[in-house]
Amino acid sequence: MGGGTAVLGALDNKKVSAVAAIYPSVTSPSAVQAARRIDTPGLVIGSGQEDIFNAGNPAKLAYNWRGPVCFRAIDKGSQAGFTEDRLRKLAIGTAAFQSGPTEITRGLLTGFLLATLNDDSTYAAFADPEASAKKVESLVGEDLAERAGVTRDA
């Protein structure tokens, strides 16, 4: 729920200069609804694969973002694999920990924050909604709407 609560915490908060929602899940009140009122630059990271638990709709959150937003889908990444309890998962033998996608996510987050908060042009691509990278899919416009499950009325 951390990604969704980051969005809720940024709502009407003048101290917030950037928001990162990593694998945001469903929240109450709705982070998707709150995103419609956030002008702060945002980074929303979702999975490049279907989640069997349907924890949330990161693409819909990004689609509803009022201000500038970057949506990134990480290949083979998921909410379940992005965890800090790596040692426990390794000790009990679960294969849920995803070191590659986790490192990609950390890199995207760091670059986005450096570009946005430090206004560092070296990292400008990390804040570009259409930037591409290996094992990362960036979606905007109609592609983002399709991933979000949003359709226009005919």
List each model region and its residues.
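Conserved hydrolase catalytic core segment
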Residues: 8-17
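Gly/Ala-rich beta-loop-alpha elbow adjacent to hydrolase catalytic centers
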Residues: 1-6
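Alpha/beta-hydrolase-fold serine-hydrolase catalytic core, especially in secreted/extracellular enzymes
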Residues: 76, 85-154
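The feature captures the conserved acid-bearing segment of alpha/beta-hydrolase catalytic domains
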Residues: 17-84
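Sec/Tat-exported extracytoplasmic proteins
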Residues: 14, 23, 116-117
